Every structure is written in structure tokens, then in C-alpha cells.
Amino acid sequence: MNVKKILLRKRRKKESLFKYISGLLHLWLGLLSSLVILVVCLTGCMYAFKNQINDFQNRNQVFIETKSEKLPLSYFEDKLKKENQQINSILIPKNPSRSVVISFFDIDSKNIQTHYFNPYTGEDLGSGNGNFDGFFNTVEALHKNLLMGDVGKHIVGVFVLVFIFMLLSGLVLWWPKRKKKLVKQAFTIKWKAKFYRINYDLHNTLGFYSLAFLLFISVTGIYITYPWVKTVVLVSLGGESISEQTQSQEGVSDSFANLMDEMLKKENEKMDVVEIKQIPLDSILYLTQKELSYPGTTTILLPDEKEPRYRIQKINTSNWLGAMLPDIIDFDRNGELKRSDLFKNKPLHQQFKELSKPLHTGEIMGTSSVIFYFLITLIGFSLPITGFVIWWKKVK
């Protein structure tokens, strides 16, 4: 095997210096980063279906038979109150064939529990099965930091940056001089050819198809890891850099004054709790539907000692992409609207901040986008393998 000759190959005739250097770096960095990229892509593929797998293993609790009328929310409130339990939150799915999910505080055991309830019969379906929770926690940790804490987090971040360079340098190496050849190379795989030729076409063609999507997934990943990446993204979307945000918070601004005013109002609401009769959950749901009239999964957080208001998040999918966009509204205990924080009214950089995780994981459009992301990350997983096979053939 002539490894040295391959790693330090001579520049070809008519090959530009830029393409020559790109080729060497693509090879060296590919060999160096392949193992980490394999782990990150594989765990990303596996983690993509976490919610779907959890729903499947708890299918007897999650999915129920639909009937004509749902029970009022007050039924569940009264039912739990009789059992010395106090509701903290309630999730009402958009899909009528899914159970209501209620988190409640058990006064006797002093524990917070989450159970599925049939919205048509009122039956308590239990807390479900969490057998895969530990597995997915490990998969997530491997994906984020290779089970090595902060050190692993930075290792993953560096190699994702390397992967981004690999994608771009791969495009440089792949780009043909002739336009006719461009179309042929971009969209064809010679399936009847020999193994090494098919492997070569898979590396090039699948890499071309997935390039933009893998770049996007990679950037949204390192956005979480590195503040400077977050700054670049936010500034490019019209926001402030992280340092500028910190500096602006040091002075008294209108937004700070508004925040203080909001906090004072909440403190006054806490003091008035005894005098105010709390309206029922069904009224809150009615008011929510009045403010946010579209169909969508709704989560209601009930008031407590620290938070005197109802906080409602409703997922809006009424857009041309079907993306899951969160709208948030607050009501006080007597049903007066105190805050309306609609996704469509937020600046672009703030919208991106709120959607950065579902954009990275593929949950942004539900199961369809999760499947698409799975296929893209599967291609990302294959690139180091097919690339290594190409290199191995040359050194044999």
C-alpha cells in the first residue's frame, strides 16, 4: 500500500492550486474526522424518531377511539381534586384520536406525575412506559458530547466545523467543467457498474443531493455550541450580537422598564389571589380559542404560588409549510388577557432562536420532516464510509 503517495499526491496537469489544496484537505480531514462524524450522524438518525418510538411503545395510552363528544376539562379537575391531586398543566392534542396529557401534583406523596387521560370517557390510562428513556438519553449525550461532558461538546463542535468544510470542499472537487457533464454527474448513479464505481457515484451524487440540507443541520447544531456562531446567525437575521445584547442589558432601556412593570403587575396579582375567584379551565380554553381560532395542540399551564397567570401555548400549523409555530398568551385568574406573544409578530432573529432546536432535529413539520431528516442524516452517515472506500481502493 502506497499510503504516503496518496496522502501527498502530486498536483495534476491543469489542476488549479485551489482545487489541489482542497483535495488534500478533503482527504486528510475526512480521515481524521470520519469516526466522530459517523457517531454524530448515526445518533442523529436514531434520535430523530424518539417521539414516534415513545408513542408506539405507549400506543395503548396515547391513541384512543374517538367519540362524538369530549368531556369538559372541569371533569378532570374535579376528578383529580377528589383524589387529593392538583393539576399543574394539561396538554390537549390537535389530533382527536390522541389522549389528553395531564401533569399534576400529588399532595399526599408530594410528587409530580404525568398521566394520559381519555378525553371522551375520562379514564386514567396511566403514566405510560419509559423503557426507552435511558436509551435515548444516552443517544442524545453521544450526539452532543460523546459522553465526555464539556470536552466532548467542543470535540463534536470542532468536527462539525470540519464536516462543513468537507461538504464545501467536496462540492469544489465534484464540480465539473462542462455543463452537460454537470447534469449527468449530479443526478445519475451507474447501478450496473462495478462495486467501486457505484460507491464512487453514491459518494458524489448523494453528497450533492444532501449538501444544502446537511449544511443547514450542521450550522443549526454548532449554533447551540458556539456563541460566535450564534452571533453570526442572529446578526445576519437582523438581531444583535451576544456581546451587544449583554451591553444593552446593562443600561435602563424601554424593554427593561416594561419588564419591571410586568413583574410589578404579577406581584400585585399574587397579592390579590385571595380576592379573585379563579375561573374554570373550560373558560380558559374558550378564551384561548377566541384569541387563537385556528386548530392546534394546546398546552395550558395553571397558576401557582410563583406564577399567578394561566400560560397557554398553542401550536399553529396554518401556514404553507405546515411548520409548527408556537403562539403564547397569558390570562390572569379572572380571565383577562395579559399578554399575547404571537410568533408571526416576532422579528426574524427571534423566530429563529425559538425554532433552532426543531429546525435542527427535524421536528419542525412533524413526522414528515423527521423522516426527511432521517434520510438526510443517513446520507451524512454514509459519506465517511463511501469516502473511505474510495481512498482504500487507491492505496491497495
Task: Give residue ranges: language-model regions.
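Conserved histidines in hydrophobic membrane contexts and catalytic metal-binding motifs
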Residues: 2-396
